[in-house]
Each structure stands twice: as C-alpha cells, then as structure tokens.
C-alpha cells in the first residue's frame, strides 16, 4: 500500500492508516494529512493542488488523504470540524493546521515546516 515518493497516500481502512502513519513517523519527514470528503466541492477543487504539493515537497514531506466519512475516528482524533482540513505533524506532534481550500496558505505552511523555499 506504500506510495512512491511524490504521491498522495490514500488511507481507507483504520489498520492501513495506523501502519502508514507509523512508517511515516519513522521517516522523520513532515507529515501532511488532507482530511476530505467525497461530497465536499472545495475538497475536490484543492485535490490537484495537494497532489502537486506532494510532488514539490517529496524529499521533505509525506502526504496523506483521509476521507472523514471512512475514518471518522481519525478525523475526531485530530479535531477535524470542517473540510478540507490539513494537519501537519512533525516529530510525532501536530505543528500546524490549515482549514479550508486555501492553496497559498497551505503551500506557505508546508514550506515553513519543511524549511524548503519554493516559488
């Protein structure tokens, strides 16, 4: 179920999510989680942007997509109340959140936490 570098990893089952998250934490890279829903128009709008960011930051971050309807407990664990919500984890701790389909804010927040300057 592992994705190649630069790809968004979709997690649809709780046991797959747990394994993928543990593996990502061991990489010491920034973890970026897109909490989304199939019925959410802003989520669909930002999906290609999120995929592009996964390619742009592939050397310093791992990107996940979690459907809040499929993994409700995971969404609750991270305090997700609106979609899309992007949660950033570094060294096992939540370091930032971006709520809404705000691509510039998402890009800037990822760049800040990876230390990677991109245009």
Swiss-Prot record:
GO terms assigned for molecular function: protein-disulfide reductase activity
Subcellular compartments: Cytoplasm
Disulfide bridge positions per record: 40-43
Record domain Thioredoxin: where: 2-115
PROSITE patterns: THIOREDOXIN_1, THIOREDOXIN_2
SUPFAM superfamilies hit by this protein: Thioredoxin-like (SSF52833)
Function as written in the Swiss-Prot or TrEMBL entry: Participates in various redox reactions through the reversible oxidation of the active center dithiol to a disulfide. The H form is known to activate a number of cytosolic enzymes.
Protein name: Thioredoxin H-type 2
Species name: Brassica napus (Rape)
